[in-house]
Amino acid sequence: MARTLVVKATAGIDAPERCSQAFTVAATAAAAGVPVSLWLTGESAWFALPGRAATFDLPHAAPLPDLLEAVLAAGKVTLCTQCAARRGIGADDVIPGVRVAGAATFVAEATADTAQALVY
């Protein structure tokens, strides 16, 4: 069984390189056929909203909407429940395919025998 790559993005426009790294690694793994679970936490939670990824710009980086689309197509994208609540984001507000789940789900995914977790 292939290992699942669990990527936790904690940064958004406040730390663009770290944000881009998380999305790039997740999308690259998905493109390589690795099972991927991308978690949007902290300031990256905003990218669960339609159109928000398009507002992100980092020179010499792949467009965030393309990276997010790649992960959505081949893996899972999860918005942190508490992060969403702190930002007034509801489950009906997010991009289709994004689920909302909390710490217990993250811990279960990240500690599975077949998982490798990365936090950016």
Task: Give residue spans per PLM region.
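Histidine-anchored nucleotide/phosphate-binding helix
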Residues: C19-A32
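Small/aliphatic-rich secondary-structure junction motif
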Residues: A32-F47
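Aromatic- and Gly/Pro-rich donor/ligand-binding loops
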Residues: L118-Y120
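N-terminal beta-loop-helix "entrance" segment that forms/cooperates
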Residues: S44-L58
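Short, glycine-rich nucleotide/cofactor-binding loops
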Residues: V6-S20, G51-R52
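Residues at the starts of beta-strands that form the adenosine-phosphate
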Residues: T4, P35-S37, K76
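A glycine-rich helix N-cap at a beta->alpha junction
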Residues: A54-A84
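A short aromatic-anchored loop/beta-hairpin motif
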Residues: R87, A91-I95, V100-A108
